[in-house]
């Protein structure tokens, strides 16, 4: 990237943050700075064209969720606690919202420029996204034919200009048209939820992509032949998603699934927090529309970038338009039936998406088929639409294992999927429980219990990411599996508490939030503070905004401890501020895969302590969620985690460094490659062997009581269903 472009990137990333005199950065503005880094990937000429288009899609999707959740929360705060300032930046809710809206408009200008450039490059590569403002006669004739194909799927509703608008669902696209003859004025509301987002045809080797919303808008007079279409626009409403179970009246039977379903219905009907308009309306028409939507002008964004860019998936073209293929390595060196024997002697670390998640699925099947296995207990937060892990758990229950699934029904925007899976797993014979009333269970924790004669042994897995094979190929995550008995006992104690609706107790080996995570984190930071200039801290996480943790990191810096923070997203602490954070560095990697793993490292050499787990350094992870962390204690797993940290240190392609003013820049020059590419090469080629000699002796096990498994009921006809799922 040229020096001028880097300077522009620096300016765009920093000028919208809190004032330099504050050591802390407003959370919402820090998140917008992260999403800007995503948008900058869409502008990077080194990124293949269709991948740049994908980053543009991700940017818009991220922003929609941000408005639904964070601006929804801020809107409620502005109403309920308007005088309560943000403890980090001192900004009041209304001021925060105003600044977010300003920054969003600023970023929109960059988004428009990027889209224009991508569109031109697509055309040069044989994929023409039609512009109905300047369309050729042949393209218009072909488009008219496509319009005829979908015409019967369109269901316009026409109302008098003085009537209330019908309800516009969040995230759905509508065409709003103003109709009139003489003094009679009407409105047409046309939902597009029944038609595909795009269509296409080919002329002389050029693929013509027809976005359905502009297509229907262009041919609207053909649909409304009896009406006089004066003007029209494409409209999308983003509604507040800040709805909680506490907002839903209790049901007599206290059925949590029903309460969550009711909450989802309520969420769909919340007030708008943003409106997007594609197409120009006259000022009076625009004002009337916003009045009917009850949305202020400040919340409205007129854009020329299509709302839906999913047409990317239909574009062919040369291989150079996409990233080189990088498939997760399926073979990690173990065959089916070898996992238990290997893990009993060695801890196993897996790194996604460089390695496949299927070996973990194989482990569940091996447990299902092992006559010595008594039980499988697992926490489930987000699963794929057709989950291989859910099928493996169902299979295990059908084989007579006691399968306990803690399913968090409140995983935002995955609630319905989790409701469906809770019913399916119950039908399979699994015991299904839910999260705690005041704490979401966000941990990625699994424990498999076996009985050899009169002795029990356990295999425990802790992960940084969801048990989801789809996101397992899109996010960087880690999974650590061990047969250490103290880890198994801690995991069992955590599940025992959760079954009883209690917060898991402080653990001996694992860190279990909310009781163990922050205290252990603070203790180890204090340990490094005591070492002064010899102290070392390296943390890879997705976000940092907890004041107590940030103040402790400032103490580390003031004591001379070298602190490296690899924070993908929100980072509310400014590095390099003299007298405060001059020994702290902050960097962020945005690349091909979404950085999602968490590594906490304290010290170096033989004294280094290394942990992985599911939680970031946000208030919610430290205080309002159940999270699980496990220490890497074997030389092999520690070496692999240090490889990850070293790759991040050496990244000169996708890493951006945070400056004291809160802006982010890419380092110029120097040797180094993309950390993700380096780690793909390392982990995809890495294999273990069941024939490896046993690892160093494990700590002495804590005595345990024998476990009596509860028999699982099997519904009739389930075997036939299960065979169809896993075949």
Where are these regions (language model features)?
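N-terminal localization/anchoring segments of enzymes in phospholipid and broader phosphate metabolism
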Residues: 1-537, 555, 559, 571-727
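Hydrophobic alpha/beta core scaffold segments
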Residues: 562-566
């Amino acid at each position: 990237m040229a020096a001028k472009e880097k300077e522009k990137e620096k300016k765009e990333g920093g000028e919208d943050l809190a004032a330099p005199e504050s050591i802390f950065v407003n959370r919402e503005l820090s998140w917008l700075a992260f999403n800007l880094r995503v948008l900058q990937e869409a502008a990077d000429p080194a990124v293949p064209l269709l991948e740049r288009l994908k980053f543009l899609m991700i940017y818009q999707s991220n922003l929609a969720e941000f408005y639904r959740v964070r601006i929804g929360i801020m809107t409620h705060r502005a109403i309920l606690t308007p005088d309560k300032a943000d403890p980090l930046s001192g900004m009041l809710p209304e001021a925060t919202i105003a600044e977010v809206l300003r920054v969003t408009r600023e970023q929109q200008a960059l988004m428009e420029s990027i889209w224009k450039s991508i569109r031109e490059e697509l055309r040069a590569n044989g994929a023409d996204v039609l512009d109905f403002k300047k369309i050729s006669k042949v393209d218009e004739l072909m488009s008219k034919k496509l319009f005829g194909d979908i015409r019967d799927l369109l269901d316009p509703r026409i109302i008098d200009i003085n009537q209330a608008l019908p309800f516009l669902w969040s995230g759905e696209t509508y065409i709003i048209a103003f109709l009139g003859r003489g003094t009679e004025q009407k409105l047409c509301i046309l939902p597009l939820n029944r038609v595909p987002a795009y269509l296409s045809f080919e002329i002389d080797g050029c693929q013509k992509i027809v976005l359905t919303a502009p297509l229907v808008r262009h041919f609207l007079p053909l649909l409304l032949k009896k009406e006089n279409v004066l003007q029209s626009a494409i409209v999308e409403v983003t509604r507040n998603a800040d709805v909680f179970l506490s907002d839903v009246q209790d049901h007599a039977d206290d059925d949590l699934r029903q309460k969550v379903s009711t909450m989802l219905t309520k969420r769909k009907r919340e007030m708008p927090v943003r409106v997007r308009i594609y197409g120009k309306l006259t000022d009076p028409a625009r004002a009337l529309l916003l009045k009917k939507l009850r949305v202020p002008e400040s919340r409205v964004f007129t854009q020329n970038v299509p709302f839906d860019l999913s047409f990317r998936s239909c574009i062919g073209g040369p291989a150079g338009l996409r990233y080189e293929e990088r498939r997760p390595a399926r073979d990690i060196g173990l065959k089916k039936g070898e996992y238990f024997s290997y893990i009993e002697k060695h801890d196993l670390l897996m790194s996604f998406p460089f390695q496949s998640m299927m070996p973990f699925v194989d482990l569940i099947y091996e447990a299902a088929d092992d006559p010595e296995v008594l039980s499988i207990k697992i926490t489930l937060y987000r699963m794929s639409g057709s989950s291989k892990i859910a099928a493996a758990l169902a299979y295990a229950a059908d084989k007579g294992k006691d399968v306990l699934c803690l399913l968090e029904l409140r995983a935002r925007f995955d609630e319905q999927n989790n409701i469906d899976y809770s019913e399916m797993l119950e039908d399979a014979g699994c015991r299904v429980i839910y999260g705690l009333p005041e704490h979401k269970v966000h941990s990625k924790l699994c424990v498999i219990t076996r009985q050899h004669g009169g002795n029990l042994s356990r295999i425990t897995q802790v992960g940084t990411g969801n048990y989801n094979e789809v996101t397992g190929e899109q996010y960087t995550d880690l999974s650590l599996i061990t047969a250490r008995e103290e880890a198994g006992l801690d995991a069992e104690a955590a599940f025992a508490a959760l079954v009883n609706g209690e917060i898991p107790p402080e653990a001996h080996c694992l860190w279990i939030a909310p009781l163990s995570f922050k205290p252990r984190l603070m203790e180890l930071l204090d340990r490094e503070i005591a070492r002064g200039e010899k102290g070392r801290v390296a943390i890879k996480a997705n976000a940092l905004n907890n004041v107590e943790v940030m103040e402790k990191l400032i103490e580390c810096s003031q004591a001379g401890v070298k602190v490296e923070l690899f924070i993908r997203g929100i980072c509310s602490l400014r590095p390099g501020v003299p007298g405060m954070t001059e020994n702290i560095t902050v960097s962020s990697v945005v690349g091909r895969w979404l950085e999602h793993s968490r590594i906490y490292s304290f010290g170096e050499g033989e004294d280094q302590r290394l942990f992985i787990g599911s939680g970031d350094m946000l208030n919610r992870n430290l205080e309002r969620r159940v999270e699980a962390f496990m220490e890497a204690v074997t030389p092999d797993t520690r070496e692999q985690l240090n490889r990850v940290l070293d790759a991040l240190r050496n990244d000169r392609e996708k890493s951006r460094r945070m400056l004291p003013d809160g802006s982010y820049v890419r380092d110029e020059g120097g040797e180094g490659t993309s950390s993700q590419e380096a780690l793909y090469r390392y982990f995809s080629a890495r294999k273990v062997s069941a024939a490896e000699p046993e690892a160093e002796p494990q700590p002495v096990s804590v005595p345990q009581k024998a476990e009596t498994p509860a028999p699982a009921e099997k519904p009739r006809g389930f075997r036939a269903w299960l065979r169809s799922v896993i075949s």
